Amino acid sequence: MGNPRSPLDRRLRFRNVPFLPPRIAASSTTTARSLKAKTMEMRFTIAWMWFPSVLLILGLLTPPSNGCTVDVGRNVSIREQCRLRNGATFSKGDIEGNFSGPVVVELDYEDIDITGERQRLRFHLSGLGCPTKENIRKDNESDVNGGIRWALYIQTGDAKYGIRNQHLSIRLMYPGEKNTQQLLGSDFSCERHRRPSTPLGKNAEVPPATRTSSTYGVLSAFVVWIGSGLNIIWWTGIVLLAADALGLGERWLRLALSHRDKHHASRTAALQCQRDMLLRQRRRARRLHAVSEGKLQEEKKRQSALVWNVEARPFPSTHQLIVLPPPVASAPPAVPSQPPEYSSVFPPV
């Protein structure tokens, strides 16, 4: 049926367009059904796209509370669990017991980065002995009485090609010498694409062998980074959010561009509708008048169209004509039927 408030509705043909109120003549063509559809679309967008996407972005911006876990190895006890502090990872523990010979410590370090990807580092520490005075005298023996406190320190460098470069250092602190800290290099075996380097300072140059971006190119690193299941979920939400934001931006831009011509377009549509209706009324009147004409009307039209000096009968009038009395016979006619003689008008000289 259409929208009765629309100026283009076919039911307006039978209305008096010049006397239509302006709010009806210039109203939009939005129906109640389309408004309901837009409302449902907005609810669907908020429920299934915006809300999960906002949660995913908040999850990306919020760092994990426990960034890593340390699994104990042989004769190792964890005193303090791994945590994040100022962008660096710390883990502390104690090696307890009485040891004869070199100490072997095996630790599994598992890192959860900000993108939710898990990376496990397995490193092997061997030959750890307490450098007491007795052990210094003995070249081939190392006895540990009491304990050795160890600390794991991992600092994350700048991201390159989607791979984080980490610097790992081990610190050993002995009970007898509390103010002494010794940095030890170790034999590391790293799974996946992370290769921790030897202890480095802040401004130290990273050796080429420890650069993670040298082995993997841009494409392979991107595939490895996106390949995680959790990353796929996050990126799906981000893509949906971007698509919805683009659609909403396009709708707002189109509305802003068409806002200027909205009044002009509605007025033009109303005037065009009025013109069409007037033309239809004229055609309808002509058609009805042509059908009602008979032979008598055609004869009258033909006689009225003749030359002026030919006598024609006038159209009948609704008003009664005033009938004058006939002229007296003795009186000369007011207008002679014959032209006068020449001699009577101009007498001869």
Curated annotation (Swiss-Prot):
Keywords assigned: Host membrane, Membrane, Transmembrane, Transmembrane helix
Chain residue ranges for the region called Disordered: 328-349
Cell compartment(s), UniProt: Host membrane
Membrane keyword on record: yes
Annotated transmembrane regions: 221-241
GO cellular component: host cell membrane; membrane
Membrane topology: Single-pass membrane protein
InterPro entries: US30
Pfam families from the UniProt entry: US30
Transmembrane helix is among the record's keywords: yes
Composition bias type Pro residues, residue spans: 328-339
The protein's name: Uncharacterized protein US30
Native organism: Human cytomegalovirus (strain Merlin) (HHV-5)
Lineage: Viruses, Duplodnaviria, Heunggongvirae, Peploviricota, Herviviricetes
